[in-house]
A protein has these predicted regions:
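Short Pro-Gly-centered beta-turn/loop motif in secreted/extracellular proteins
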Residues: 22-44, 97-120
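Structured interaction patches on ligand/partner-binding surfaces of diverse proteins
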Residues: 42-64, 117-142
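Hydrophobic beta-strand residues in large extracellular and virion-surface proteins
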Residues: 8-10, 35-37, 50, 60, ...
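A short, amphipathic beta-strand motif
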Residues: 1-2, 66-74
Length: 142
């Protein structure tokens, strides 16, 4: 399971102070009230106003991840972006000295912008769009 070490940060509604860091499959009792959750997936999932009722189990569900297998031919400058609502949200810069990555990611549309470390002009910049699907692997090679 890609999420066996997944953590969830639990906070009282509207507060930034961490109340508890819960393991993904752990059952935990909370006082009746509303909570905000930050699920430490990639990219992160933020859920607000989760209601906890007395004598009731509240289950949080979200899509299973996919896996990105990424390969660069050599040292490169590259960044990963999430495509959402016709906008790009920066997620990660890749280490220019690493050429292979395996990243567990939430389903969605993404883009990688890449340029070889030896290319000195922006005309040599490459861009690849791809989709991560739940339960599937996506291979991207530059």
């Amino acid at each position: 399971n890609e999420y066996e070490d997944l953590k969830i940060i639990v906070r009282k509604k509207g507060e930034m102070k961490t109340l508890y860091v819960q393991d993904f499959n752990e059952k935990q009792k909370y006082l009746v009230g509303e909570y905000d959750l930050e699920i430490l997936t990639f990219p992160r999932i933020n859920l607000s106003d989760i209601k906890i009722s007395q004598s009731h189990t509240t289950t949080i569900q979200f899509q299973n991840p996919g896996v990105l297998n990424l390969s660069f031919p050599g040292s490169a400058y590259a960044s990963l972006y999430l495509e959402k609502d016709n906008e790009l949200k920066w997620l990660k810069d890749f280490n220019p000295n690493l050429t292979r990555y395996k990243i567990v990611m939430q389903p969605g549309r993404y883009r990688i912008i890449y340029r070889s470390i030896n290319a000195k002009k922006s005309i040599y910049t490459e861009e690849k769009r791809f989709e991560i699907k739940s339960g599937a692997s996506t291979n991207i090679n530059f």
